[in-house]
């Protein structure tokens, strides 16, 4: 079977998961011999997969030749846990904002070069057609929440994002020039909230405030979307208060 075939890739993945499951179910570290016996894989295959997992830090190779699950799994698990906690903590605040404004309230996180919508309070009365469903994505530089994440980057990371994506426009009002984007990010630092001025969708404006974790890094954003003519910039203060309350529950007291 060719190493490039889909069946081979699936087989390798299944064997990788099998070895990680065996390590997870063990009360202590296991030797290569133990793992080979329990997995029923030949020793060369088992050793090759374990080496790859060690390089990726999913598995730790201990003195004496034994193996145990690595700390990277804990890091990834904490990321998932934080995201679940954010949804649970944010939803009451989102409901209150929706009740007060009557507009669509979104909760989004960063994934790669996009934001992903993970929760929403919406009603037909808001008058905003929801184009991107829960799980939908949008570029960072075209969204209010995305700009919050960009404002959290250092200069090198920001330039890397710009070079990688090319910051293309979606509407005639999109921010697609680097200098203009830097000016907007500087304004976010000063005012504490971000604006999408019909940059993703014509006729829709958004306001957003950042949610921070205990390290003071942006982990999510809460946003309000409304028809352009109906947006009230005073709502930004409500968003900031809600985001601050959620951040405090996540351990951020900045």
Predicted regions and their residues:
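Short loop/turn microsegments at loop-to-beta-strand junctions
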Residues: 8, 64, 105, 183, ...
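Amphipathic alpha-helical regulatory segments at dimerization interfaces
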Residues: 38, 89-100, 191, 245, ...
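A structural signal for short hydrophobic beta-strand segments in well-ordered beta-sheet cores
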Residues: 59-60, 107-108, 211
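Cysteine/selenocysteine-centered motifs that mediate thiol-based redox chemistry or coordinate metal-sulfur cofactors
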Residues: 157-162, 166-168, 244-254
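Extended hydrophobic
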Residues: 173-245
């Amino acid at each position: 079977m060719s190493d490039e075939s889909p069946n081979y890739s699936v087989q390798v993945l299944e064997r990788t998961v099998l070895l990680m499951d065996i390590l997870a179910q063990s009360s202590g570290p296991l030797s290569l011999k133990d793992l080979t016996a329990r997995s029923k894989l030949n020793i060369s295959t088992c050793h090759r997969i374990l080496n790859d997992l060690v390089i990726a830090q999913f598995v730790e190779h201990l003195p004496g030749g034994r193996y145990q699950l690595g700390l990277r799994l804990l890091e990834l698990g904490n990321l998932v846990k934080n995201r679940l906690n954010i949804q649970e903590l944010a939803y009451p605040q989102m409901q209150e904002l929706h009740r007060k404004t009557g507009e669509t309230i979104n909760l989004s996180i960063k994934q790669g070069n996009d934001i992903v919508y993970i929760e929403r309070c919406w009603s037909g009365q808001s008058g905003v057609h929801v184009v991107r469903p829960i799980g939908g994505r949008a570029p960072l530089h075209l969204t209010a929440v995305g700009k919050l994440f960009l404002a959290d980057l250092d200069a090198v990371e920001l330039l890397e994002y710009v070079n990688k994506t090319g910051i293309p426009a979606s509407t005639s009002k999109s921010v697609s020039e680097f200098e203009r984007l830097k000016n907007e990010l500087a304004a976010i630092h000063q005012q504490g909230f971000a604006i999408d001025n019909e940059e993703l969708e014509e006729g829709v404006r958004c306001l957003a405030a950042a949610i921070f974790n205990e390290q003071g890094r942006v982990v999510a954003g809460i946003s309000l979307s409304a028809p352009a003519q109906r947006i009230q910039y005073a709502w930004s203060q409500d968003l900031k208060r809600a985001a601050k309350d959620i951040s405090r529950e996540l351990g951020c007291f900045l």
